[in-house]
Amino acid sequence: VTAPLSERSATVTDAVKLQRRAERAAAGRFLAEGPNLIEAAARRGMVERVFATESAAQRYQPLLDGLAVVLVNERAMKLLSETVTPPGLVAVCRQPQITLDEVLAGAPGLVAVAADISDPGNAGTLIRLADAMGAAAVIFAGDAVDPFNGKCVRSSAGSILSVPVVCAPDTAAVIDRLRAAGLRVLATTLDGEATLDDVQGELAGRTAWLFGAEAHGLSPAVARHADRRVVIPMTGDVDSLNVAAAAAICLYQSAYARRSGALG
């Protein structure tokens, strides 16, 4: 039996490099940590290899059946892991490759666009919400976080593997493409000319929701490209919501309208 690899092994150090955005982009690979994410990636044939401590390999033996497993020592696992209490399993996975052209070719009915979102936790939650509400894709536009950042992958709870995710640096160009493809683009802003209640009747149609960054929302220049600027009506002592909360409200309203339209 081969001894577990140490933290100095080239196989381990090469995988650790995937914690960096540039390395992930160059390799087209990302790290999935923990049994739930690895099981979801394995179901889709994305797993290249799984690093496991000896105890984790025993505990999760049925999950690892049929996968390429590399045993590592505890110090190597600490390096590979990005969590406080490592579960003892980290997989190198192939990134799904999908383009905006491919998304639009499918005539999507609901799309979420995240512009300049830098917080990986919010980004992952947005992906999970989009999956739950039946969105056809999530587009990370502008200067946004890498959706395959470890925290984002974990926050998505595996949804990043089931809903198509596209990165596009030019937000205005993305909006123009969405509109040209027949989607109505609604931008969430604090100074919208319409409330979410006002547009409820329009939401059964093909819609792209545009959400801005956590701290300052959408820039006026970007919001101007949308078909409508929409504000979420709020009472109490609250004048803004974080991007995940705003997305949950808007995407649910769209999903509800689409269901009602299908039933009607």
Where are these regions (language model features)?
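Short, ordered loop/turn segments at secondary-structure junctions
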Residues: 55, 142-145, 215
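RNA substrate-binding interface of SAM-dependent RNA methyltransferases
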Residues: 36, 97-98, 103-192
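Structural motif
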Residues: 52-56, 94, 116
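Short, hydrophobic beta-strand segments that form beta-sheet elements in well-ordered domains
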Residues: 30-32, 49-54, 184-189, 209-212
